[in-house]
Amino acid sequence: MAKTRTKKNANKRVVKGTLDQKHTEKINKFENMSKALPKKKEKLKKHEAQLEELMSLNPNKFTHENIRRKSYLMDSIKNLKEEINSIENCSESLDYIVNTLPILVNYYDNGDIVDDDKEELISEAMADGKKNILSYFFKETSQQENSSESNNDIVKNGTGGSTSKRKKIQPSNRCSGSKTGKVTETKPRLSRAKLYDNYLNVTDPHYRKSVKKSQNVCSVPDCDGEKILNQNDGYMVCKKCGFSEPILLTTDKPNYKEPTQDSGTYAYKRINHLTEILSQLQAKESTDIPNKVYEAIKRELKKRKIDKNDLDIFRLRRILKKLNYRKFYEHVPHILQVINGKEPPNFSRADEMKIKALFKSIQKPFAIYCPKNRKNFLNYSYVLHKFCELLELDEYTNYFPLLKNNAKLLQHDKIWKNICDYQGWYFYKSL
């Protein structure tokens, strides 16, 4: 059965609110708050009585329900007192008046406001002879002000003596002059949309004011030409007078006027890899291990009933293998130091320099005796194990295990024996 999808009405008109509507909602809110004051006081007395009844009970016989009820009543009493105090002191309404009074005065009492059709559903309460919305807060001072305001809304027709009231005063007729007919400068006129925007900025914390993009106008006096962007050179150039000024551009597009640098490929250096392995063993590397790895290790230690102070590198490797965290093998000394605070193995500077010197010295004999079908260097853990044997650093040999595969271990021993003969070193068999 085919499904039918109802089309939305694309021409549906979205109605935008007005300042008059928002202001009326605020006034209604304040009135409702005042009407709700007796109920809040009654609720406060009721909660205070319930709390006093709970406080009179023996604390040793308190149940979880009593504790929750007591906490709820204390919070409710505190909130009710704050609300009652705010309503009685008119704190919220006074703050609203102080913040919005200049905007409301301009909106309702300023005859120079321009209706630019950006604010919809404009209230015509004043034009219909109803009270000004500010009358909720202020009383009219005199009848003369009302008569003068009504006279300003009367426009005489040509030579005829008849008069007619208009709901909106046309901006073109708002000019001041003397009896001789001389016209002076008109005051700057405001728009309803601008006032509405200012009102929302003051009253609505979630409202984001729309920021208009600044026009690219030339700064040369008496020019006012439009500036255009020359992206290749990074300049803003005036189309009228040719004035240019540099501008900072951030872009990922390449500039073809600038020469491109060749990113050359560099050969992998074995000595760098050896240095990295030594740093990892001594926990000197800078690495960031996720917290979930530490938490998983601690849970596994608790499950196996292993004291963290008895944990060593080899046990930690087995735990990481079980947890499927093999990629952290090379950071085992660092992880161990974080878990139990034990100092990792540490080579003296002299021993570390000797190891690096021995490593550099075997590069030439390795190139000579390396089988033709072999491309990679010897296993680094195997090489470091042999260096520790030659330098009599037996306490470090356990940190560099030999190969588990006997066939591969024999191949390494064969190459290493030739290197030892070439260098004049003593050869230690692995098997």
UniProtKB/Swiss-Prot annotation:
Keywords assigned: Coiled coil, Metal-binding, Transcription, Transcription regulation, Zinc, Zinc-finger
Disulfide bond sites: none
Ranges of Polar residues composition bias in the record: 170-181
ZnF (unnamed) ranges: 218-241
Positions of region (Disordered): 142-187
Coiled-coil parts of chain: 28-95
Biased composition (Low complexity): 143-152
One biological process term in Gene Ontology: regulation of viral transcription
GO MF annotations, alphabetized: zinc ion binding
Known function: Putative transcription factor.
Family per record: Belongs to the nucleo-cytoplasmic large DNA viruses (NCLDVs) VLTF-3 family.
Protein's UniProt name: Putative transcription factor R429
Lineage of source species: Viruses, Varidnaviria, Bamfordvirae, Nucleocytoviricota, Megaviricetes
